[in-house]
Amino acid sequence: MLVAAGQFAVTSVWEKNAEICASLMAQAAENDVSLFVLPEALLARDDHDADLSVKSAQLLEGEFLGRLRRESKRNMMTTILTIHVPSTPGRAWNMLVALQAGNIVARYAKLHLYDAFAIQESRRVDAGNEIAPLLEVEGMKVGLMTCYDLRFPELALAQALQGAEILVLPAAWVRGPLKEHHWSTLLAARALDTTCYMVAAGECGNKNIGQSRIIDPFGVTIAAASEMPALIMAEVTPERVRQVRAQLPVLNNRRFAPPQLL
């Protein structure tokens, strides 16, 4: 099946961001994409107000997702993205949602909040407390992760042991010394750790690197974007997963217990 990742620079106006997302969804659907991943925290972004995305939080029943759900009804594609959803007054969850045929079929509150590199996501965002069930798309099992989750191999491994063949990752990977190197290294490492495909969508713009990637179970990049707005696509197959796992049976060779969420 064909998978895709779309990237753009999120603006401070949620209506504009919704239209960009809907346009990318339409482009992906026109190419018969089955699984489409958008970046993280799509409601609003402002280089001078780090809290704008949380301040702009909307309910899952809100207008932003309403626009995307209407677009989703037009195709057979599964679309993955994250937005901030109100939790308690002044706070939010960083919530991944999966859309199919206009319906929200999965949700996942980000487990690992980005309290690193002088940024403290937990100041305004509440962490989730459970791993999302796997999705099924065109007969392939899909695991859900968000951005900073990439640095924690236990989440990817837990989902691979549950049967995941593809791991999706909406992200807004912040620029900084060696951060692009970390991104490419970690994506390849998670693919190799789990012998899963990785489909990662990274927001571009002044603060984030973009560089969306699709990586095969052997850690090979099969589609990649630069720092500019882009839509990338690649073919993925269960046969490739089986082939790699026959040659590199790391999931069967493990001598450690399966990861457990604290």
From Swiss-Prot:
Catalyzed reactions per annotation: N-(4-oxoglutaryl)-L-cysteinylglycine + H2O = L-cysteinylglycine + 2-oxoglutarate
Entry-linked InterPro entries: C-N_Hydrolase, C-N_Hydrolase_sf, De_GSH_amidase, UPF0012_CS
The first-level EC class reads hydrolase
Any idea where the CN hydrolase domain is?
1-238
Alphabetized, the UniProt keywords read: Hydrolase
- Give EC number(s), comma-separated: 3.5.1.128
Cross-referenced CDD domains:
nitrilase_3
| Gene Ontology MF terms | deaminated glutathione amidase activity
Q: Which Pfam families does the UniProt entry name for this protein?
A: CN_hydrolase
User: Active site located where?
Assistant: E40, K110, C147
Report the sequence similarity comment from the record: Belongs to the carbon-nitrogen hydrolase superfamily. NIT1/NIT2 family.
Described function: Hydrolyzes deaminated glutathione (dGSH) to 2-oxoglutarate and L-cysteinylglycine, and no activity on glutathione or L-glutamine. May function as a metabolite repair enzyme.
Q: Which PANTHER family match?
A: DEAMINATED GLUTATHIONE AMIDASE (PTHR23088:SF27), NITRILASE-RELATED (PTHR23088)
Q: What name does this protein carry?
A: Deaminated glutathione amidase
Source species, please? Escherichia coli O157:H7
Could you tell me the gene encoding this protein? ybeM
